[in-house]
């Protein structure tokens, strides 16, 4: 995998420590909580989620193992591990999601 292009701190008063590691074509969300969680999103998936958010759809499967559940203040990402029978989840508030989108857009402008 390529090196991290940018690290964005998405932590806010309403959430655990949340960091986005931006690579050339994907983002890895890392939540440093009691049980650290990590979820990968492709740039096109982030763009699709933004469109879905404005369409007021409540739940969408991003990939076989990953779904997004929208609520009033944000989105809950749930990653299911079929091999291990467990799941990981990360909640992003819409302000955090917008901050991540802006960071990606700024990187794309500077390329």
Whereabouts are the PLM-identified features?
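Positively charged, low-complexity terminal tracts
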Residues: 1-111
């Amino acid at each position: 995998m390529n090196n991290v292009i940018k690290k964005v701190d998405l932590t806010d008063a309403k959430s655990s420590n949340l960091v986005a590691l931006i690579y050339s074509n994907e983002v890895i969300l890392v939540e440093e909580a009691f049980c650290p969680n990590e979820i990968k999103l492709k740039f096109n998936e982030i763009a699709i989620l933004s469109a879905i958010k404005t369409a007021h759809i409540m739940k969408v499967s991003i990939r076989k193992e990953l779904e997004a559940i929208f609520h009033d203040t944000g989105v809950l990402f749930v990653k299911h591990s079929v091999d291990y029978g467990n799941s990981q989840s990360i909640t992003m508030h819409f302000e955090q999601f917008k901050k991540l989108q802006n960071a990606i857009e700024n990187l794309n402008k500077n390329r």
